[in-house]
Amino acid sequence: MATTIDFSRYPLTGWYPGHMLKAGRQMQASLKLVDLVVELLDARIPGSSRNPIFDQLFRGRPTFILLNKADLASPRVSREWTASLRKEGKKVVFLDARDTRQTLELVPAWRRAALAERSKGRTALNRP
């Protein structure tokens, strides 16, 4: 189900800083503990704020894409991104993270997604 990413092919100099390499390795080592992926992007620049390695790293995991600062984004471009991300099987939510109510309303949806994974026998819930 999960694939292994060879982070050694990413140089430590140039565009891929060492702290990103280290974080990628740590995430890969912790994948068995991941039930649900929540990826936070800037709604104004979702393509630029997205890490393409995450698609491979978290393949097979339910994923929520949160597009923050939705009030500042172009509605037309937001619709296009929503369609594209949903084709990839991701749940897309636009929000203003300063609004605590919006943020708290996401928790039940995350629980439902994690429980759906549990029913498929692919969850890490109840882990030590």
Task: For every predicted segment, state its role.
Residues 6, 69-70:
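Short, solvent-exposed coil/turn linker segments
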Residues 64, 70-128:
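Canonical P-loop GTPase G-domain recognition
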Residues 14, 68-69:
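Short, contiguous strand/loop micro-motifs
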Residues 50-68, 74:
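P-loop/Walker A phosphate-binding loop and immediately adjacent motor/lid segment at beta-alpha junctions
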Residues 1-58:
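N-terminal accessory targeting/assembly segments
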